[in-house]
């Protein structure tokens, strides 16, 4: 009797239907779902009220009513305990070992307790996923035990880089490591979880195997995520780099360098600060990865040089980075090195002249003399564009709190000459820079759904930065209070040939961009002067001093959707508003697939030196923010319901927002000026 007949006999003796047992349980998010975003019980869908309170399940982290989460039990060690936020104190968690959980999680917990031996055995056996699928047909208990293992394995794919894996999860990944070739996401999870107990030779063998790029298993057989790809994504490479054992290995570093080279140079340019931070932990990363990667591309050369220059403001980092930077410059042509230092001197020269408070005529003579002596100078954020002069008559000092200067630079590139207006702000602009990096990634990831107008930001010191101003744009404050018109009329006046339908279709993209960007970044202090509208009707946010849910007025920070924006879409009951909501949901789904990327990008707030708001943006704060906003691991339907609910809620102007706008208008009237306006 062959194997298939044996399996069939076993199934017959069990006297059960295969279809009811064979499906793998859905993965649970294993995150603490924020209660303020949930209005209905996850199970029975009853609306919460004073009489129907919210309760978290300590395993899946979802929110239920007291009836649907009335089970209590001790959570097995195989299951990751869903931890509440630090500020969420419960006396029961100290007094009792038992934890509240929902009915589904409790039944799973009970099964894991009974079948822990089978789970441990099947986890440690050297079986492929295909063999595990076959063994499930032997009997019910084996089937459920293997399904539990597969459920844990699928759950690993939704964990953030900062979330610790259990021993069982690490074991599953390591046992199946040779099945992950050409599935870069799973390769990254496996390598990033490599632990001290394994031999270095095993790591090197695995790296060499992955380097052969042999595909043995398709995505369906190893239960990959939908966005699985043989090509690396930035967050996947950086997650591997976070493992100290892996990054300390020479073979691994060379393999990582080859994978970095597969990325676009524009993407590498954006993550230079993260690479420098990695190099400061492991100097060999500078020599084996960063210097070879950056020394062959002009834009990367400029980006690395000026990022190092900024990090070196910190005295300790100055001594650490000086030999690294010298080694980097030795690799470059002497003419490129001269150009780098010329640009650095030009930035210092402009800032020094601002502090001298020169007259416009003095400005012109000083800049012209400098350029005539040293020649045209390349811009620090774009080496292909050179500054050839300054339009001194248009130099302006804005009448806002920090008195920023507008410096109009005459520049030349392959498209000819033009004026680029630079706003020199006397405050830390690194949060603005981070937001622009996030915006650029959003444009790539949600292509077709969003259209974010981005601009260059260059931090000079921790108290000064240059911002490239967007041409032909006005604040929504000016449109409403200065021009005395609506957003729709303003755009139509500037674009007389556009139809209302075409205008609204175009506006949907920019409105979705505005909402998802502000939501994922937790952007606060959103008033009408911080939202610009370009000539062709694009919304553009500026001034990102308050992020991750901070707001100077202590308002709840979610999205800024004004009454004018809703009217532009045709009103809350219009077809275009419904398309806008649907596109917000689609963009949100795409963003959630890259949750690890957003976590890694926001980690800049924690490691950037000199420190940004010291001790405020800890790893825990960033992790909790990403979990609250993106719900990694939660199913798409539940997450979509949350984002649509937030869009609907934000579209209705609250009395607190009206008061905030009114006080802002009074403040503006008193100083009789508006910020960052460029007349059309």
Ranges and model annotations:
Residues 2-29, 36-39, 100, 109, ...:
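Eukaryotic intrinsically disordered, low-complexity regulatory tails and linkers enriched
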Residues 129, 147-302:
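Alpha-helical solenoid scaffolds in large eukaryotic transport, assembly, and signaling factors
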Residues 373-523, 535-540, 545-548:
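Conserved ATP-binding subdomain of kinase catalytic cores across diverse folds
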Residues 529-530:
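Conserved protein-kinase catalytic-loop position immediately C-terminal to the HRD catalytic Asp
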């Amino acid at each position: 009797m062959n194997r298939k007949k044996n399996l069939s006999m076993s199934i017959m003796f069990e006297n059960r239907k295969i279809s009811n047992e064979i499906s793998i349980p859905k993965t649970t998010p294993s995150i603490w779902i924020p209660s303020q975003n949930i209005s209905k019980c996850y199970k029975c869908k009853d609306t919460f009220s004073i009489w129907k309170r919210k309760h978290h399940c300590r395993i899946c982290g979802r929110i239920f009513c007291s009836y649907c989460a009335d089970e209590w039990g001790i959570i097995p060690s195989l299951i990751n305990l869903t931890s509440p936020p630090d500020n969420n104190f419960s006396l029961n968690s100290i007094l009792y070992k038992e934890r509240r959980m929902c009915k589904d999680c409790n039944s799973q917990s009970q099964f894991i307790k009974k079948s822990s031996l089978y789970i441990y055995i099947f986890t440690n056996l050297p079986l492929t996923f295909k063999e595990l699928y076959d063994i499930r047909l032997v009997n019910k208990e084996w089937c459920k035990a293997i399904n539990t293992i597969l459920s844990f394995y699928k759950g690993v794919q939704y964990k953030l880089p900062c979330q610790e894996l259990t021993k069982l999860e690490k074991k599953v990944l390591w046992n199946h490591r040779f099945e992950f070739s050409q599935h870069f996401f799973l390769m990254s999870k496996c390598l990033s979880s490599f632990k001290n107990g394994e031999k270095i030779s095993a790591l090197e063998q695995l790296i060499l195997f992955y380097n052969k790029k042999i595909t043995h298993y398709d995505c369906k057989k190893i239960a990959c995520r939908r966005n699985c790809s043989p090509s690396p994504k930035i967050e996947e490479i950086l997650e591997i780099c976070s493992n100290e054992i892996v990054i300390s290995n020479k073979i691994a570093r060379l393999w990582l360098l080859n994978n970095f080279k597969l990325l676009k140079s524009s993407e590498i340019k954006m993550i230079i600060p993260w690479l420098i931070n990695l190099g400061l932990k492991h100097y060999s990363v500078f020599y084996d990865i960063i210097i070879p990667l950056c020394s062959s591309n002009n834009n990367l050369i400029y980006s690395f040089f000026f990022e190092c220059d900024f990090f070196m403001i910190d005295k300790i980092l100055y001594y650490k980075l000086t030999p690294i930077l010298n080694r980097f410059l030795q690799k470059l042509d002497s003419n490129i090195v001269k150009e780098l230092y010329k640009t650095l001197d030009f930035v210092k020269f402009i800032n020094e002249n601002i502090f001298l408070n020169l007259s416009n005529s003095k400005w012109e003579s000083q800049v012209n003399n400098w350029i005539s002596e040293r020649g045209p100078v390349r811009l620090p954020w774009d080496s292909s564009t050179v500054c050839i002069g300054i339009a001194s008559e248009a130099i302006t000092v804005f009448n806002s709190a920090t008195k920023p200067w507008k410096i109009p630079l005459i520049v030349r590139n392959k498209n000819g000459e033009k004026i680029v207006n630079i706003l020199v702000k006397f405050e830390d602009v690194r949060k603005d820079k981070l937001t622009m990096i996030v915006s650029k990634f959003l444009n790539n990831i949600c292509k077709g759904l969003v259209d974010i107008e981005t601009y260059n930001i260059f931090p000079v010191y921790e108290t000064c930065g240059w911002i490239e101003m967007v041409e032909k744009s006005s604040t929504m404050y000016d449109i409403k209070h200065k021009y005395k018109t609506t957003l729709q009329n303003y755009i139509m006046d500037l674009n007389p040939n556009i139809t209302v339908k075409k205008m609204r279709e175009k506006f949907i993209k920019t409105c979705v961009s505005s909402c998802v960007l502000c939501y994922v970044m937790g952007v606060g202090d959103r008033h009408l002067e911080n939202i610009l509208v370009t000539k062709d009707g694009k919304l553009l946010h500026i001034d990102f001093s308050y992020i991750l849910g901070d707001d100077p007025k202590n308002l709840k920070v979610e999205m800024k959707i004004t009454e004018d924006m809703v009217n532009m879409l045709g009103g809350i009951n219009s077809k275009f508003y419904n398309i806008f909501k649907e596109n917000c949901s689609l963009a949100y789904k795409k963003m959630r697939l890259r949750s690890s990327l957003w976590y890694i990008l926001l980690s800049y707030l924690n490691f950037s030196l000199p420190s940004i708001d010291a001790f405020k943006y800890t790893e825990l704060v960033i992790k909790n923010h990403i979990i609250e906003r993106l719900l990694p691991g939660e199913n798409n339907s539940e997450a979509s319901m949350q984002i649509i609910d937030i869009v609907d809620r934000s579209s209705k102007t609250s009395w607190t927002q009206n008061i905030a706008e009114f006080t802002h208008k009074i403040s503006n009237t008193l100083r009789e000026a508006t910020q960052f306006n460029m007349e059309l």
